[in-house]
Amino acid sequence: MATSHKSENSLLFEWLSEYWHNLLFQLDDELAINTFESRMAKDVTIKINHDHVPRQVYFEYITGTRAAHDLTLISQKQLKVWEAPGGGGSIAYEGELMYNDKKTGEKQTGSVVMIADIRKGDDGNFTIVQSTEIATR
């Protein structure tokens, strides 16, 4: 039977935390691109603040944000998780981060609540197949 967790961090939380670290918070652009390409399904459905966002537009947003800002993770937590019997599942995630503008040095705090549906493929790897984000900055 599938399990639902509230307070302990799940395998999905650990996987999603690593995804965000590799995508936004480390300095290697190639690692960020490879992380996006390998962990974001080609046919992913993405919504940010009520707008549907195509995968390519989301990718450009991520790479543009990386180019313009140094990003620091302030906090993150798992809000709720459902783990599918064969792997994958759904997770509600909350994160807070600092944007430091590379040109001006201006700092802003941002936050996101994300609900991600994650599938385990035949190869055993996880991919995000659907993401809904409420993001503020």
PLM regions with names:
Residues I33-S38, K42-P85, G89:
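A solvent-exposed, acidic/Ser-Thr-rich amphipathic alpha-helical stretch
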Residues S17-E18, F59, E94, V113:
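Generic alpha-helical structural signal
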Residues A67-R137:
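A beta-strand edge to alpha-helix "cap/lid" segment located at domain peripheries
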Residues S17, L24-Q26, S38, H52-P54, ...:
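A short linear-motif detector with a strong N-terminal bias
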Residues M1-S38, K42:
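Short, low-complexity N-terminal intrinsically disordered segments enriched in polar/charged residues
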